[in-house]
């Protein structure tokens, strides 16, 4: 395992890439409504990213089968946990939730973030799933400080979500991030206190709880990308890119613009 500690100059570049991801998610939030296709959302995202001088990192990113991802964002609706492929056949409906995962490459460094949006009015049960999943993200981030261990992050996420009876997906993880989208170490959403590698200042991590309303078991669809819950119950996914610091982690990505939109629309 090779972990690259980032310099302050490198972190500045990563901050720019992640700010663009946050702005892209906010731009997409303006378009999320019943009747919109996920392919339309993908076109909005790619144009926005390229207009800001960056590259959509996910486009042509290979899966374990060596097949390139065909779009600029992942659009995962309801029981799709991650890696949903945008399509003109995938039309948003009132009451859906959609997790949009977005990555950018800007000036040689990557940004990565995900947000689960409500499409119109959603049920109270699903609202709670989204709330708890987002809370677990920030509880995990609170543990991402120099001197703690990687397992402290996973424990905080797992403990919070399981208190509500939710499933914590284990086969999918967060990751280190920098010049490459996926770097060491893998950042699990489960674990025990004091386990795993020691966290050091300058580590950049993408922390991303993927939480299911029911059982944590997942399956792969025939498209070899979309990962779904086996029981077909909804899943939520939130992600921030952070820097490990002394005392308090620094969040490089942002939900501020997205949450402002949500306050207006939902």
Each language-model region and where it sits:
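Active-site neighborhoods and metal-handling regions in enzymes and metal-associated proteins
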Residues: 1-266
């Amino acid at each position: 395992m090779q972990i690259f500690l980032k310099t302050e100059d490198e972190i500045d570049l990563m901050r720019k890439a992640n700010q663009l991801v946050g702005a892209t998610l906010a731009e997409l939030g303006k378009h999320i409504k019943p009747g919109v296709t996920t392919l339309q959302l993908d076109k909005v995202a790619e144009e926005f990213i390229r207009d800001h001088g960056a590259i959509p990192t996910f486009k042509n990113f290979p899966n374990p089968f060596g097949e390139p991802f065909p779009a600029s964002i992942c659009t995962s609706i309801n029981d799709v946990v991650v890696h949903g492929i945008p399509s003109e056949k995938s039309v948003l409906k009132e009451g859906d939730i959609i997790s949009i995962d977005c990555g950018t490459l800007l000036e040689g460094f990557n940004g990565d973030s995900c947000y689960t949006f409500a499409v119109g009015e959603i049920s109270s049960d699903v609202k709670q799933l989204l709330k708890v999943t987002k809370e677990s993200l920030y509880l995990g981030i609170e543990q991402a400080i120099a001197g703690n261990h990687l397992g402290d992050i996973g424990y905080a996420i797992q403990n919070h979500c399981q208190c509500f009876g939710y499933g914590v997906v284990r086969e999918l993880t967060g990751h280190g991030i920098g010049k490459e989208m996926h770097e060491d170490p893998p950042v699990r959403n489960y674990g025990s206190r004091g386990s795993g590698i020691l966290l050091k200042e300058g580590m950049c991590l993408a922390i991303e709880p993927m939480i299911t309303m029911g059982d944590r078991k997942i399956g792969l669809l025939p498209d070899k990308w979309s990962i779904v819950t086996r029981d077909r119950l909804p899943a939520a996914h939130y992600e921030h890119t952070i820097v490990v610091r002394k005392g308090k982690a620094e969040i490089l990505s942002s939900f501020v613009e997205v949450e402002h939109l949500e306050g207006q629309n939902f």
